[in-house]
């Protein structure tokens, strides 16, 4: 029947897509590249800056290929290009566009660090810096991460006035709560002591009343000694 044949073909097609997805999923999640948490970094003109980059692979790597690229509004270029033979080898640089660039990373001891430093910064160095990694052991799967560098004349001082005010208010509130708690405990202690004194006073007063009224157990009930 045509309907049953079409349904069978559709099932086979979806099964094939599912198997392909399961095959590609480990690859897509294995190789990762990171340039840190900060997506933008600032540096002063004329100084040196470290552009961080690390990678990780669940399947290991052999003859890993890495490179850094620079991209601005009107310029794109490869800054440095190199390879890493294996996990016991340090990266080797094959191409370097600028003498101001130095490879600072190491891949030994599972550091997987391919960071670079850029000396004598210029305002024209402002732009996007992307760290690329391609792993032949994972069917040449490639991953990259980008960080934006902003070269400035001087770093702006962060105004912490608001932060200090907030911390002062929070500290004051906490101090006030502690003070109130201590006062509350002190008052409770005084009340407890006062109640204990009142109780002792009532017991003592009750004993005196019994003595004066000649009640059982009082001194008035005691008989005088018999004269012989």
Curated annotation (Swiss-Prot):
* Gene3D superfamilies documented for this protein: Immunoglobulins
**Membrane topology according to the record:** Single-pass type I membrane protein
Segments on the Cytoplasmic side according to the record's topology features: 184-228
Oligomeric state and interaction partners are given as: A voltage-gated sodium (Nav) channel consists of an ion-conducting pore-forming alpha subunit functional on its own that is regulated by one or more beta subunits. The beta subunit SCN4B is disulfide-linked to the pore-forming alpha subunit. Interacts with SCN1A; regulatory subunit of SCN1A/Nav1.1. Interacts with SCN2A; regulatory subunit of SCN2A/Nav1.2.
List all annotated glycosylation positions.
45, 71, 113
The organism's superkingdom is given as Eukaryota
**GO CC annotation:** intercalated disc; plasma membrane; voltage-gated sodium channel complex
Q: What is this protein called?
A: Sodium channel regulatory subunit beta-4
**Region labeled Disordered — which residues?**
198-228
Please state where this protein is localized: Cell membrane
* Extracellular face residues: 31-162
Q: Which family does it belong to?
A: Belongs to the sodium channel auxiliary subunit SCN4B (TC 8.A.17) family.
